[in-house]
């Protein structure tokens, strides 16, 4: 910091959690639905720099995944900005995609 009048003191130790395994059954469903909604777009697992409460579930032995289902224009990414927005079509497509994803993953007909 450029100001020696300010100090930062960590409170407690960081909480870590194990990574969730890439379940092939889940990946298959995501790939199938992605191909229906956005043909030609590959499914690539990534790790977000953001944080969630998923670490508490993973530490309890519950695999936890983050997935938005929102398509954004790379030249107009405004996530968490003061002018945050997405296209209406992206919102509606993402809503339907996530609905069908949850329905597929929670049924016996995966």
Regions found by a protein language model. Give the residues of each.
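Metal-dependent amide/peptide-bond hydrolase catalytic core
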Residues: 1-99, 103-110
């Amino acid at each position: 910091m450029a100001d020696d009048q300010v100090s930062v003191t960590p409170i407690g130790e960081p909480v870590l959690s194990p990574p969730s395994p890439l379940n092939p059954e889940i990946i298959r469903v995501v790939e199938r639905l992605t191909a229906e909604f956005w043909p030609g777009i590959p499914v690539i697992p990534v790790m977000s720099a953001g944080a969630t409460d998923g670490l508490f579930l993973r530490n309890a032995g519950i695999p936890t995944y983050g997935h938005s289902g929102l398509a954004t224009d790379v030249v107009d990414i405004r996530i968490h900005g003061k002018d945050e927005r997405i296209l209406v079509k992206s919102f509606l497509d993402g809503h339907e995609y996530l609905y069908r994803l949850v329905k597929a993953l929670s049924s016996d007909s995966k």
